Swiss-Prot record:
Name assigned to this protein: 2-phospho-L-lactate transferase
Cofactor(s) needed by this chain: Mg(2+)
Subunit structure: Homodimer.
Family matches, as NCBIfam families: F420_cofD
Pathway the protein acts in: Cofactor biosynthesis; coenzyme F420 biosynthesis
Protein family (similarity comment): Belongs to the CofD family.
GO molecular-function terms, A-Z: LPPG:FO 2-phospho-L-lactate transferase activity; magnesium ion binding
Length: 306
């Protein structure tokens, strides 16, 4: 039986996992629920791949490859390399241990919904926090580019985010069981520094989520430092949706429900403009280069409820 959450975190597969490493060192991991983006989920070489969910699980289990922020540390790639030799192209480079985990998830999905499969795998990995996929339903994401429509990983991996982005579209799905309750029962909800459009956006656009967020104390960490995203094409995606590619644009996306935005010292010049949208702006170092940075940011976020 999961303990009632003190903190609920909305997460994608980049940025936020680093913050989670700090949070679990500041509060009891059992008091943390992580709601994870699933819009990138799909099948690859016959196995079900849930990139962001697995990254969060591996991070909380202490086995994440911190050089890439996906997959298992020290993994081998014999299966991936053999498949390529056999003429079976794989867009994603999946390690052998990582693949075994995905095979198990695929088998479990033949018997149960995704949130139950994730719960079983979470316990098997010894993860103390509760990890919830945002939805049990499949969601399609399309990156509309100046070269035509592309699947997310086609754009991100095969094309290395190079084409110009005109729009980002994803289907709206229903929250998985427990998602809305995890938000409404939390002392604080944190939107981690993941991509606001393709990672956090699909979560907050699900039915009922924004209404739930309006009822609670919500803080967010901007994924921008000095006008540049921590990683990935967040800037391109935000501009394609009509937002400024900056911490100010993040504030615009979250303005309907956000109580506080934490921004980096390099973005301090935006504080005045952001305060027109968000009632509280905190300026600190948000670039998490080591465990000390991660703990410090976690303490700043949780200061008022610790």
């Amino acid at each position: 039986m999961w303990r009632q959450s003190m903190i609920t975190v909305l997460s994608g597969g980049t940025g936020t996992p680093k913050l989670l490493q700090g949070l679990v060192r500041v509060v009891d991991p059992e008091e943390i629920t992580v709601i994870v983006n699933t819009v990138e989920n799909g099948y690859l070489s016959g196995v079900y791949v849930a990139p962001d969910v697995d990254t969060v699980l591996y991070t909380l289990a202490g086995i994440i490859n911190e050089e890439t922020w996906y997959g298992v540390e020290g993994d081998t790639f014999i299966t991936h390399e053999t498949l390529r030799e056999l003429g079976c192209p794989e867009l994603l480079r999946i390690g052998d241990r990582d693949r075994a985990f995905k095979i198990q998830k695929t088998l479990l999905l033949g018997e149960m919904p995704l949130h139950r499969a994730v719960e079983i795998q979470s316990r098997a990995l010894g993860v103390e926090s509760r990890v919830l996929p945002m939805s049990n339903e499949d969601s399609d994401i399309v990156i509309v580019t100046d070269e035509g429509d592309m699947e997310f990983h086609e754009f991100l991996v095969e094309r290395r985010s190079e084409p110009g982005v005109l729009d980002v579209r994803f289907s709206r799905v229903k929250p998985a069981p427990g998602v809305l309750d995890a938000i409404e029962s939390a002392d604080m909800v944190i939107l981690g520094p993941s991509n606001p459009v393709t990672s956090i956006g699909p979560i907050i656009n699900m039915e009922g989520v924004t209404d739930s967020l309006r009822k609670v104390n919500v803080s967010a960490v901007s994924p921008f430092t000095g006008g540049r995203p921590f990683s990935g094409p967040a800037g391109k995606f935000m501009e394609a949706k009509g937002y400024d590619a900056s911490s100010l644009g993040v504030a615009e996306i979250y303005a309907d429900f956000l109580d506080r935005l934490v921004i980096d010292e390099t973005d301090s010049d935006l504080k005045g403009e952001i305060e027109k949208l968000i009632k509280e702006v905190t300026i600190t170092k948000t670039n998490m280069e080591n465990i000390g940075d991660k703990i410090m940011l976690a303490r700043i976020l949780l200061g008022e409820i610790l």
